Amino acid sequence: MAQLLDSPGFIERSAAVPHKAAAAPATRDAAAPAAVPGAAVSFELVGKVFDGPRGPAAALREVTLDIARGGVFGVIGRSGAGKSTLLRLVNGLERPTSGAVRVNGVDVGTLDERGLVALRRRIGMVFQHFNLLSAKTVAQNIGLPLKIAGVPKAERARKVDALLDLVGLAAKRDAYPASLSGGQKQRVGIARALVHDPALLLCDEATSALDPETTQSILALLADINRRLGLTIMLITHEMEVIRAVCDTVAVVEQGEVVETGPVWRVFGDPRHGATRALLRTLVHDLPADLAARVRPLDGAAPLPCGAQLLLDVRYTGASGGEPDLGALTAALARNVGDAVHFVHGGLDRIQGRVQGRLVIAASLAARGAAGPDRIAAALAAARRHANRVEVLGYV
């Protein structure tokens, strides 16, 4: 895909559409057109089948998705799940075998070559590998699509300068790609993707080749571009950290199917599919191995021995929207089950303004003797008044 979009042939076909002068990014906020009702991108029962050496292979199966205008929509899944195929359907590099893909209400599958060129002029593309021309400067790399499209030199210069300011590379205008860091190269790629003032920006694993610190800076840039320009971003990744940092909504793709979708806070706080839970495993506060090895399961109606600590798994999903009152939680547990209540593991995070996470709490039962089912039930009832979900892990 990168080679096709960056090839001279692709740029020349794009240039076949008459050039329309565009405002510089700095003025886009004030001059942005009124929002158009409906989704920016919609997939309606989309299937895609490729011919393979062993026969037909389904890459996508009955995918139905709406991507809201002006948002940042993340698509996540394992390698080979079908994420990049979704992206290729949006810009017409692939045609669906069944169903329809619509961009701003236009069925991409019905467009002829000229229609596809016009569509791609309104879609920016950011790649995992930067695909910069080594013999051209930063400014020349950014301005090349405009030059081929016949944009006058003075206008090209104004547009390139505005984009360099937008991505924080004004001082690198005359530098060559060999002198740039990975993050700087990706900033050039982002600026180049914005030269035609696209309404939609597609990002295909745009940070997977970068170190963690640089990744965060690129994600911050994408979020800033989304806010300042109001364009829709569709972002493909296999990293949940990327989704958490920048996306409003996420779809989880597994073996060609969308198995879960929703606001990022909901999918992270209350994952409903096994594939989602597997992808989130690196972000979940699992019990340390030494503590997990000591946990003993409850034995039906048998009381816990004197001196045991009841372990409660307390979850905040963000559904309530408020701030958790940890003081009230521990006080309620102390009143109902024991003299000493303390946190042994976990942590809380804030996603889209909602607090969520996991806390493992130990309630010591020594002072009141053995604890039977009634006291354990009281502990659960007390904790559930202050959290979204509470379960007993066992005791130590």
Swiss-Prot record:
Its EC number is 7.4.2.11. It is a peripheral membrane protein. Pfam families: ABC_tran (PF00005), NIL (PF09383). Its main location: membrane. Keywords: Amino-acid transport, ATP-binding, Cell inner membrane, Cell membrane, Membrane, Nucleotide-binding, Translocase, Transport. It is found in: Cell inner membrane. Residues 41-280 form the ABC transporter domain. InterPro entries: AAA+_ATPase, ABC_transporter-like_ATP-bd, ABC_transporter-like_CS, ACT-like_dom_sf, MetN_ABC, MetN_ABC_transporter-like, NIL_domain, P-loop_NTPase. It is an enzyme of class 7 (translocase). GO terms for cellular component: plasma membrane. It catalyses: L-methionine(out) + ATP + H2O = L-methionine(in) + ADP + phosphate + H(+); D-methionine(out) + ATP + H2O = D-methionine(in) + ADP + phosphate + H(+). ATP binds at G77, R78, S79, G80, A81, G82, K83, S84. One of its GO terms (molecular function) is ABC-type D-methionine transporter activity. The complex is composed of two ATP-binding proteins (MetN), two transmembrane proteins (MetI) and a solute-binding protein (MetQ). Belongs to the ABC transporter superfamily. Methionine importer (TC 3.A.1.24) family. Part of the ABC transporter complex MetNIQ involved in methionine import. Responsible for energy coupling to the transport system. This is Methionine import ATP-binding protein MetN 2.
